[in-house]
């Protein structure tokens, strides 16, 4: 029986993780989890799984629900996430919280020797060199949960590294893949949140609509697998059935395909290095009638090019890209800027903020905060057309 901690259990990845835990009750035991503010979800899961500790991170809710419920201890605030992952009973940590708040508990889990099922891409994008040094130092196992990276993880394990010429991340194309370019300036938040394939949170759905999510995943793939940016490609695949592709030196391509359901990569990350037992959800290839692949339109998706630019620059540039995007997407979701202003703000940040090569966590965090301040200042001063 493996103890599991899930950071961000009420989100889409967390919800899918619970499905896997229910399917394999003899293999996994939910020992701790966090929610931001959804007490109803937390209460129901405490009643179902009886974890040792839970955490509510919303600062407005500190103390509201007491210090325990049934036999489960209740903690509050982002700092308490570290307590969840350090429990002796926890063997694997699923990091599914959004944004930079995932980095400190991830570092704590690495230093505690826990297996990491990482779904918080911002941790690797912003702090990639630091995280990789810690993983090597503590001999930690880190398995990606994102469907594309998990697919590549499995494909790369089956092939000799010297035989792999390139890796490819697939993308659905998001909510606006077929929308006329001139209409992008005027799309609404509601339109952006209407993803054709996946059910995800608002921020990641907006990222997907502009392929910025895929840009973040390109940077993440670089740090996870060690491929150069020239060896990492992106293709539009509207069916979302093929999740990852590797091209071998003999000219062949190996594809990982599955029904678009997050339970597959989550189950793999929990069971790894052991094989995943037969899942209750099955899909037959005979139901996959069409596979389409085509290159992304960089006029439609300028954020993807900016991600490659930031990744190749290295240092704090990927973190600048990520922080600028987080702030810009928040402004869009509040209907304060247009959809096409998001990449313009990111480009402005990359051009105006000095890139550095931090050696410490604080160095990365300082540049992250500088970027967020810059975006807010640009918006408040009207520095970028909205």
From Swiss-Prot:
Extent of the signal sequence: none
Pathway terms, separated by semicolons: Isoprenoid biosynthesis; isopentenyl diphosphate biosynthesis via DXP pathway; isopentenyl diphosphate from 1-deoxy-D-xylulose 5-phosphate: step 1/6
Cofactor(s) this protein requires: Mg(2+); Mn(2+)
Enzymatic reactions: 2-C-methyl-D-erythritol 4-phosphate + NADP(+) = 1-deoxy-D-xylulose 5-phosphate + NADPH + H(+)
Binding site for Mn(2+): 146, 148, 217
Gene3D superfamilies on file: 1.10.1740.10, NAD(P)-binding Rossmann-like Domain
Pfam family, one: DXP_reductoisom
Positions bound to 1-deoxy-D-xylulose 5-phosphate: 121, 147-148, 172, 195, 208, 213-214, 217
EC number(s) per entry: 1.1.1.267
Residues reported in the UniProt entry to bind NADPH: 10-13, 38, 120, 122, 201
Keyword set, alphabetical order: Isoprene biosynthesis, Manganese, Metal-binding, NADP, Oxidoreductase
Domain of life: Bacteria
Enzyme class: oxidoreductase
Molecular function (Gene Ontology), one example: manganese ion binding
GO biological process per UniProt: isopentenyl diphosphate biosynthetic process, methylerythritol 4-phosphate pathway involved in terpenoid biosynthetic process
Family that this chain belongs to: Belongs to the DXR family.
PANTHER family named among the record's database cross-references: 1-DEOXY-D-XYLULOSE 5-PHOSPHATE REDUCTOISOMERASE (PTHR30525), 1-DEOXY-D-XYLULOSE 5-PHOSPHATE REDUCTOISOMERASE, CHLOROPLASTIC (PTHR30525:SF0)
Role noted for this protein: Catalyzes the NADPH-dependent rearrangement and reduction of 1-deoxy-D-xylulose-5-phosphate (DXP) to 2-C-methyl-D-erythritol 4-phosphate (MEP).
Annotated protein name in UniProt: 1-deoxy-D-xylulose 5-phosphate reductoisomerase
């Amino acid at each position: 029986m493996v103890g599991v901690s899930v950071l961000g259990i009420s989100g889409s990845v967390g919800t899918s993780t619970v499905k896997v835990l229910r399917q394999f009750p003899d293999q996994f035991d939910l020992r701790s989890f966090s929610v931001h503010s959804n007490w109803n979800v937390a209460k129901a899961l405490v009643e179902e799984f009886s974890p040792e500790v839970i955490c509510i991170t919303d600062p407005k809710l500190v103390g509201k629900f007491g210090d325990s419920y049934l036999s489960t201890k209740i903690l509050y605030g982002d700092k308490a996430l570290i307590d969840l992952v350090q429990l002796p009973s926890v063997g694997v940590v699923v990091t599914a919280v959004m944004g930079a708040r995932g980095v400190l508990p991830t570092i704590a889990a690495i230093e505690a020797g826990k297996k990491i099922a990482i779904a918080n891409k911002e941790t690797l994008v912003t702090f990639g060199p630091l995280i990789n040094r810690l993983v090597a130092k503590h001999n930690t196992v880190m398995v990606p949960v994102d469907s594309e990276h998990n697919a590549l993880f499995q494909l790369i394990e089956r092939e000799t590294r010297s035989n792999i010429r390139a890796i490819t991340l697939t993308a659905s194309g998001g909510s606006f893949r077929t929308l006329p370019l001139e209409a992008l300036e005027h799309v609404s938040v509601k339109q952006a949140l209407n993803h054709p394939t996946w059910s995800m949170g608002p921020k990641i759905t907006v990222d997907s609509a502009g392929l910025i999510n895929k840009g973040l995943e390109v940077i993440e793939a670089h740090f996870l697998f060690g491929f150069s940016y020239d060896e990492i490609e992106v293709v539009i695949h509207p069916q979302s059935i093929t999740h990852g592709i590797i091209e071998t030196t003999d000219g062949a391509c190996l594809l990982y395909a599955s029904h678009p359901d997050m339970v597959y990569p989550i189950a793999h990350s929990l069971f790894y290095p052991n094989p995943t037992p037969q899942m209750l959800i099955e899909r037959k290839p005979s139901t996959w009638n069409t596979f389409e692949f085509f290159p992304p339109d960089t006029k439609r998706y300028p954020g993807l090019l900016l991600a490659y630019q930031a990744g190749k620059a290295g240092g704090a540039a990927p973190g600048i890209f990520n922080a600028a995007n987080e702030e810009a997407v928040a402004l869009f979701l509040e209907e304060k800027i247009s959809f096409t202003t998001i990449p313009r703000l990111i480009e402005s940040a990359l051009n105006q903020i000095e890139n550095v090569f931090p050696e410490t966590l604080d160095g990365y965090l300082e540049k992250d905060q500088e970027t967020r301040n810059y975006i807010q200042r640009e918006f408040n001063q009207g520095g970028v057309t909205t």
